[in-house]
A protein has these predicted regions:
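Long, charged/polar, surface-exposed segments that mediate recognition or autoinhibition
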Residues: 100-103
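Beta-strand secondary-structure signal
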Residues: 136-138
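N-terminal targeting sequences that direct proteins away from the cytosol to non-cytosolic compartments
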Residues: 2-87, 105-107, 111-118, 126-132, ...
Length: 192
């Protein structure tokens, strides 16, 4: 009998941390920031996030395809929540970062976490995010946990000393090419 109230409490708490559906249409305030997008199709918003200003969307699960929104990461803050500040400190955003520093910040963050065994920035080119000058870049990496080769495409900009970054990542085989058009359509709808 003592177990029944505990099970009821756990069942009631589950929806509070559940993933949620992102329906087509205007979606303001992504990653608790000025970012807004208009998805054409449905996405799933994952409840677990890597930080206060991070939001992750996926279609099939974050290991198969995911878009991460980093919204307004300010000076002195990291892209992701730090797990071990002493042994694995993450790089911090600087208000004076150049656009060309953004790919290196992402790579250094992934490497500092020990989450990747190999990573390379493959291309970099000027772009726009909304009306802002930005950098678009592609990268590839292999996670230490599953050794699956993944590809990524990202766009980032600095606004008033804060970083706005959107990344798309998926396994190189099949999923990256299958869903890249959905990411790019979402990217074209982004506003700051």
């Amino acid at each position: 009998m003592k177990l029944l109230p505990l099970l009821i409490a756990l069942a009631a708490a589950t929806p509070a941390v559940a993933n949620s559906l992102v329906s087509p249409g205007v979606r303001p305030g992504i990653a608790r920031s000025k970012l807004a997008a208009t998805p054409v199709g449905e996405w799933n918003r994952l409840s677990r996030v890597g930080g206060n200003n991070v939001e992750v969307w996926t279609i099939d699960g974050d290991l198969l395809n995911k878009i991460s929104f980093y919204g307004g990461i300010g000076r002195g803050r990291t892209l992701l929540r730090q797990v071990d500040r002493k042994r694995q400190p993450l790089p911090q955003v600087s208000a004076t970062m150049l656009l060309t520093d953004i790919p290196a910040l992402l790579e250094t963050t992934y490497r500092a976490q020990g989450a990747v065994v190999q990573m390379s920035i493959d291309t970099q080119q000027p772009a726009t995010l909304g009306t802002r000058k930005a950098i678009r870049f592609t990268y590839s990496f292999t996670r230490s946990t599953d050794e699956v080769q993944r590809k990524g495409e990202a766009i980032g900009t600095m606004v008033d000393g804060a970083l706005y970054l959107v990344t798309y990542e998926a396994p190189s085989l099949y999923f990256f090419d299958r869903d890249i058009a959905k990411y790019r359509a979402l990217l074209n709808s982004l506003a700051l």
